[in-house]
Amino acid sequence: MSQSTSVFRRNGFTFKQFFVAHDRCAMKVGTDGILLGAWAPVAGVKRCLDIGAGSGLLALMLAQRTDDSVMIDAVELESEAAAQAQENINQSPWAERINVHTADILQWITQQTVRFDLIISNPPYYQQGVECATPQREQARYTTTLDHPSLLTCAAECITEEGFFCVVLPEQIGNGFTELALSMGWHLRLRTDVAENEARLPHRVLLAFSPQAGECFSDRLVIRGPDQNYSEAYTALTQAFYLFM
């Protein structure tokens, strides 16, 4: 089924159970975040952490996918984005389950005593390069404020022994991220390579790491079929969220 353009509003994106305004956020709602929020394993989780929450998209998706006992912390450094995430969450059915923190994750994590069963992040991945239009967008896109070793260290400090740390990255950067994670003691447990269609090479990769060793499951997801409509696999993954699926 093709995605209807009517799910877009001028300042945000309407899902089946919630609306995400993102006009005050550097990075907008996009396929990467939707993929990650729908894909991350949630079975048995009790507490979740969203690092770099932006508009609150991932926290809201996790809230929709989990039962009412699951608590979610969403940490966002940029104050305007954090304020908008809070507004989005306040207007959702899960305001009492999601706590937004305007903070630097590197400092916030040192003050935490709880551990998380699921940590999720759609992290920055560009090295400093082409100048961005705003400092906020630069912060969201570049690894200058949160590099990958620091991100992996943060997650390691607050994850449960059997928990999962999930990210979405461009394919090649994801391969480098995996090598780094393995060198730091993480174990790759789930990997899904994402291609736009059958004729294209994968352009994104979904990765789930755990402190605990175990079998690694990998697969491939194609977003669109030969007719350019969403594939059956992509529809099955995301239909709980997209308004017209």
Curated annotation (Swiss-Prot):
Q: List the disulfide bonds.
A: none
Q: Which Pfam families match?
A: MTS
Q: Where in the cell is it found?
A: Cytoplasm
GO-annotated molecular function: nucleic acid binding; tRNA (adenine-N6)-methyltransferase activity
What PROSITE patterns does UniProt report for this protein, alphabetically? Answer: N6_MTASE
**EC supergroup of this enzyme:** transferase
Q: Which reaction does it catalyse?
A: adenosine(37) in tRNA1(Val) + S-adenosyl-L-methionine = N(6)-methyladenosine(37) in tRNA1(Val) + S-adenosyl-L-homocysteine + H(+)
Q: Sorted alphabetically, which keywords does the UniProt record give?
A: Cytoplasm, Methyltransferase, S-adenosyl-L-methionine, Transferase, tRNA processing
Q: Which InterPro entries match?
A: DNA_methylase_N6_adenine_CS (IPR002052), SAM-dependent_MTases_sf (IPR029063), Small_mtfrase_dom (IPR007848), tRNA_Adenine-N(6)_MTase (IPR050210), tRNA_adenine-N6_MeTrfase (IPR022882)
Q: Which SUPFAM superfamilies match?
A: S-adenosyl-L-methionine-dependent methyltransferases (SSF53335)
Q: A GO CC term?
A: cytoplasm
Give any single GO term for biological process.
tRNA processing
**UniProt EC number:** 2.1.1.223
Record family assignment: Belongs to the methyltransferase superfamily. tRNA (adenine-N(6)-)-methyltransferase family.
Q: What does this protein do?
A: Specifically methylates the adenine in position 37 of tRNA(1)(Val) (anticodon cmo5UAC).
- Can you say what this protein is called? tRNA1(Val) (adenine(37)-N6)-methyltransferase
* Natural source organism: Escherichia coli O1:K1 / APEC
